[in-house]
Regions:
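Individual transmembrane alpha-helices with interfacial aromatic-anchor signatures
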Residues: 160-168
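Alpha-helical structural segments
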Residues: 12, 29-52, 60, 64-68, ...
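Amphipathic alpha-helical segments used for helix-helix packing
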Residues: 76-101, 146-152
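Hydrophobic alpha-helical segments that form the core
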Residues: 83-90, 124-146, 167-168
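Helix-turn-helix
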Residues: 1-29, 33
Length: 169
């Protein structure tokens, strides 16, 4: 991608040579959208909103959130966005700050609301940030750590979605 021109990207996609510029303002805009879609594959804002705004108790909402993450982790090998995300973790591009503002921050805010409802922690406290990290980071690890390696190194995590869920709760 880094060395490709917008025209080459369009040719490979079988679209008009000007499509990337027209729809995304250039290949940089396209890549920003790719990052947003990669994150959406793991957890869409719509799915998170549905969980957070449900009539369930905060603890039940956390369970549903974790179930969603575990299901995604069990199918992560089918998601092309995971490979993009892993590349960004290994070597962050200049597009990461906008991606965090656009895709990650709104979801993080929703997750903090849920954690606040469970813990009663002040929204901007260091303890809230740590609590959010302690929920979010294991979720990211499950999704991003390749299943073949996870199964090889930690065989008890393979195929035991219910066991993972109970342990995370």
């Amino acid at each position: 991608f880094a060395e490709a021109t917008s025209k080459e990207i369009c040719e490979r996609a079988g679209t008009n040579g000007a499509a990337v510029n027209y729809y995304f303002g250039g290949k940089e805009g396209l890549y920003e959208e790719v990052l947003i879609e990669a994150h959406r594959q793991m957890l869409s804002l719509e799915d998170l909103n549905r969980i957070i705004t449900s009539e369930a108790t905060p603890e039940e909402k956390l369970r549903v959130f974790l179930e969603h993450i575990i299901r995604t982790a069990m199918n992560a090998s089918e998601l092309w966005g995971i490979r993009i995300f892993l590349r960004e973790l290994a070597s962050p591009s200049p597009f990461v700050p906008k991606f965090i503002t656009t895709a990650v921050f709104p979801k993080s805010q929703k997750l903090r609301e849920l954690i606040r409802d469970i813990t009663g922690l002040p929204p901007d406290s260091p303890a809230m940030q740590r609590a959010t990290a302690l929920v979010a980071l294991p979720c990211m690890g499950l999704i991003l750590f390749p299943e073949k390696l996870r199964t090889l190194m930690l065989p008890a995590t393979a195929g035991d979605a219910e066991g993972l869920l109970e342990d995370m709760l």
